[in-house]
A protein has these predicted regions:
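Structural core segment of the AMP-binding/adenylate-forming
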Residues: 10-88
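Conserved A3 ("GATE") glycine/threonine-rich loop of ANL adenylate-forming enzymes
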Residues: 204, 283-291, 304-313
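Short hydrophobic/charged patches on amphipathic alpha-helices used for structural packing
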Residues: 27-28, 99-102, 188, 269
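Conserved pre-ATP/AMP-binding loop-to-beta segment of ANL
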Residues: 80, 92-115, 122, 146-152
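Adenylate-forming
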Residues: 44-59, 206-222, 262-275, 289, ...
Length: 313
């Protein structure tokens, strides 16, 4: 996705992402609505669905396939594997043409069209220009001066999410190392390997964390359960009733919180693989007050916000 995105941007081509799980009908709608003539696909199912659409399409001309293990349909005479696609440029002698295109690029150029799920009817194509990204980066530079090239961001959401796409672009702008999790089912294994300092995510991820932690607490001994619950309540009082309100906490509460933060909370975050976490933006859907309160209580650095796709958020 990132390869093709930046390759497209460099040639003033509009990038239009789709979900890997899109049905042939959904693919066909987007192809026709946006008049897409070239489509990049991943594994076998994506190829099969895309080729089914191409056979009936007057618009879609070529599929470019990332996965070399994909078997082409015997009727397919136009598709090409990604590595072979790259080699087409070896003798294209297109450097001058590309330089001219890049020099003519403008912030007013359309960068991408994001087809959101919507609540009714067909997907809506949200048109985003390069100035949308530039403005997002400008304001993030002001609001998030702590993000730097020492950070590692876990790219967990699909890059069809403008939330993840804009965040990943911002991280690249700041020199942040990007770790891409390709299989959502592997995130519990990936996080302890990567130890991200940054990660944007949707509430559903943190809801699963909340449920998992409370299942562990409820299955522990009465003594340990009492310790965990006291730690969470201490964190709630310190962070929500004092720190977040700009009020100096009583000495005893501050000392108790520091103890739990260095023991219970640090152990919890190490198990999850997020002990180095500095900033975890959360958006895309409502985050329940219960989960939000829990995350802040155990000192997980979430920042909860909202925005429209039209605002690059």
């Amino acid at each position: 996705c990132l390869f093709t995105d930046f390759g497209a941007y460099g040639n003033r081509v509009i990038s239009i992402p789709m979900y890997a799980t899109n049905s042939p009908a959904q693919i066909e709608y987007i192809i026709n609505d946006a008049e897409i003539h070239t489509l990049f696909v991943g594994e076998q199912l994506q190829y099969n669905n895309a080729f089914k659409v191409q056979k009936e399409s007057a618009v879609l001309k070529r599929l470019i396939i990332f996965d070399p293990a994909v078997k082409l349909n015997p009727e397919d005479k136009t598709s090409i594997y990604f590595d072979d696609f790259l080699r087409l440029g070896d003798n294209a002698h297109a450097e001058t043409t590309v330089k001219i295109r890049m020099n003519e690029a403008s912030a007013d150029d359309v960068a991408t069209i994001m087809y959101t799920s919507g609540t009714t009817g067909e997907s809506k194509g949200v048109v985003l220009h390069h100035f949308n990204y530039l403005e997002a980066m400008r304001i993030h530079d002001i609001r998030l001066p702590m993000v730097n090239d020492k950070d590692t961001s876990m790219c967990f959401l699909p890059l069809t999410h403008i939330f993840e796409k804009a965040w990943t672009c911002y991280c690249l702008h700041k020199g942040v190392k990007i770790a891409i999790n390709q299989d959502p089912k592997m995130i519990q294994k990936t996080l302890p390997e990567v130890h991200p300092t940054l990660m944007c995510n949707v509430p559903r991820f943190w809801e699963k964390v909340y449920v998992g932690v409370h299942e562990k607490i409820n299955s522990s001994t009465p003594f340990m359960k009492k310790i965990f619950m006291d730690a969470i309540e201490t964190g709630r009082l310190y962070n929500l009733e004092y720190k977040n309100k700009g009020i100096e906490a009583p000495f005893c509460l501050k000392a108790k919180f520091k103890f739990y933060d260095k023991t219970v909370f640090t152990l919890l975050k190490k198990v999850l693989g997020i002990e180095r976490g500095r900033l975890f933006p959360v958006a895309g859907a409502p985050l329940s007050d219960t989960v939000n309160e829990f995350l802040q209580s155990v000192n997980i650095p979430i920042v909860y916000g909202y925005g429209l796709s039209e605002t690059t958020a």
